[in-house]
Amino acid sequence: VKYLHTMIRVHDLDATLRFFIEGLGLRETRRMENEAGKYTLVFLAADETPNAEIELTHNWGSEEDYGSARNFGHLAFRVPDIYATCARLQSMGYTIHRPPRDGHMAFVKSPDRISIELLQDGHLPPQEPWASMPNTGSW
């Protein structure tokens, strides 16, 4: 058995790509446009795990509400500096729903409300402003 990918349906492909590429540092590995089916598939991967991909599926012109992403659970990424990653995502307009108070774990949501867990690679001591930030909403 070989794990291939996790598929996520997205409403705004550009916003979602910005979140995963600029915000988290993933890279686009391939893209397929299907004119007949009216959809785009974009595959993303992290440099350290190139064979474990996320497939973004964008159905052209769809206004369908895919429901609450929290039912999905979450995607998890190990990051080299959780504070810098959270600061970058926050500067891009994303809410850090569970701040990295302990220097180890945080949660943010993608543009399509997918819960994303960020885990620190190695140890960082707690630091402000993160250490005293409360949770915001659900994560």
Locations of regions flagged by a protein language model:
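Core segments of cupin and vicinal oxygen chelate
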Residues: M7-N51, S91
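Generic domain-boundary/flexible-linker signal
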Residues: L17, D65-G67, L124-P129
